[in-house]
Amino acid sequence: MQREEKQLEACLDALISQVSDIKNSLVGFIHKLENEYDRLTWPSVLDSFALLSGQLNTLNKVLKNEKTPLLRNQVIIPLLLSPDRDEEIMRLTEGRVPVFSHEVVPDHLRTKPDPDVEELEKQLSAEAARITSEAAQKQVQSMNKMCSNLLDKISKEERESELGSLRQNKQTFNPTDTNALVAAVAFGKGLSNRRPPGQGGPMAPGQTGASSMLPNATGMQVPMSLPPNQQQQHMAGVSMSQGSQPGKMPSSIKTNIKSASMHPYQR
């Protein structure tokens, strides 16, 4: 018997502590709503709700614990009723109950709801009993359909929001390539100083002049049969052009290209 009494006392102490924490959280939240509503933010409200939810879950765990005795089996009986002011009750109830008389006992030790609430519950129970099973099934199906449509809309909005955030955060360029291009254009980083052959400048040993640019120029030579006077004039023009530029190598590519262009279809 003493063991059960100790367990009951420990359970009551734990419940009083949990309820006191919940009460303090509620008082602080109500104070914010009444006095700090102008600068109250939504994250702060969510934090307050999360704190209250966690404390209520802890209280439920204490009540459902195996070591917690069944409080419903315990009976509370007032041993003394007095119309006089009781300071101890004032301290325990924080000034809310000054006396413990016949007027307040039915309210504070009530095991049933208030009469108004009890009457409303009876009306709702009577209305639920009058509904047929078919009508109730239709109402349930209608409610399920509405909930499904609402869930679909919420899921669609969530997907669209995620896709929009992905489009905004998607990177459309490579930072490495961009930095390399900027460095090449601004500072010439990574560019080669060599010139391609045939673009001017001194030629390396072993390289020829224009013949290196046109490797198939020799294949463009086409035998021509010209009259003797035109052939002499043609050869004289070539010799004059070669003689007018002393110190340069004679170029036959110009003549060959010219002759090829005059008869493109001759084989």
Swiss-Prot record:
Pfam families tied to this protein: Med8
Location in or out of the cell: Nucleus
Chief location bin: nucleus
Entry GO MF terms: transcription coregulator activity
BP terms from Gene Ontology: protein ubiquitination; regulation of transcription by RNA polymerase II
Cellular component, GO annotation: mediator complex
Keywords: Activator, Coiled coil, Nucleus, Transcription, Transcription regulation, Ubl conjugation pathway
Coiled-coil portions: 1-26, 116-160
Protein origin, superkingdom: Eukaryota
Composition-biased stretches (Polar residues): 227-245
Pathway: Protein modification; protein ubiquitination
Region spans: Disordered: 190-267
Subunit note: Component of the Mediator complex. May be part of a multisubunit E3 ubiquitin-protein ligase complex.
Stated family: Belongs to the Mediator complex subunit 8 family.
Biological role stated in the UniProt entry: Component of the Mediator complex, a coactivator involved in the regulated transcription of nearly all RNA polymerase II-dependent genes. Mediator functions as a bridge to convey information from gene-specific regulatory proteins to the basal RNA polymerase II transcription machinery. Mediator is recruited to promoters by direct interactions with regulatory proteins and serves as a scaffold for the assembly of a functional preinitiation complex with RNA polymerase II and the general transcription factors.
Name of this chain's protein: Mediator of RNA polymerase II transcription subunit 8
Organism of derivation: Xenopus tropicalis (Western clawed frog)
